[in-house]
Design a protein with these regions (language model features):
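Second-shell loop/turn segments in exported
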Residues: 33-38, 111-118
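N-terminal signal peptide c-region/cleavage motif recognized by signal peptidases
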Residues: 13-15
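Boundary at the C-terminal end of the N-terminal hydrophobic targeting segment
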Residues: 18-21
Length: 175
């Protein structure tokens, strides 16, 4: 009888943990920036840029190899966040060469948060409570916890147990 109770308790605890560690869904790749919803992959336009407020910098990052092609990336720097626009997949999606989409969103300030409420300054424990254990990795001296759905990824930079920044981006399918 005790063995069955232990097994039942183990299964119930697994179910509770699994429920808390829900996989990423499409809404996880949308954030609200200056009261404007911005989604990975949405068209980048002058109207969208203006709705986000005044950028302090708009710069050409370069032509970046991604998948089977090279694509143009631009960085748009705002107070608490950056948005990278790119002409990703214009050639395979029958779009104009100079049509851009939101290719990466970087959250740097506590007023910008993910769809699940994680912002720079949140605890690492809070991230794993809402997203699960994720994939931990080190890059250039920084610790990251990452989560992926298809070719989209959310990564949390962790410094001293707190979220320092959050990247929401596409994953190069060659990696």
């Amino acid at each position: 009888m005790t063995g069955r109770l232990s097994l039942a308790a183990l299964l119930l605890s697994f179910t509770a943990v699994a429920g808390a560690q829900q996989g990423l869904e499409e809404p996880d790749f949308t954030v609200t920036l200056n009261q404007q919803p911005v989604s990975l992959g949405q068209p980048w336009s002058d109207k969208l840029q203006a709705s986000l407020g005044k950028s302090s910098e708009d710069s050409f990052v370069g032509e970046v190899p991604f998948g089977d092609g090279n694509y143009k990336f631009y960085r748009h720097v705002f107070n608490d966040f950056d948005v990278y626009s790119a002409n990703l997949w214009w050639d395979s999606q029958s779009r104009d060469f100079d049509s851009y989409i939101v290719a990466q969103i970087t959250l740097r300030g506590a007023t910008s948060h993910t769809a699940r409420g994680i912002a720079p300054g949140s605890s690492e424990d809070n991230v794993t409570e809402l997203y699960g254990p994720g994939e931990k990795e080190s890059s250039d001296g920084a610790e990251w916890i990452g989560y992926q759905r298809d070719n989209k990824r959310i990564s949390f930079e962790i410094v001293k147990g707190k979220v320092n920044s959050i990247n929401i981006n596409y994953v190069d399918d060659r990696q």
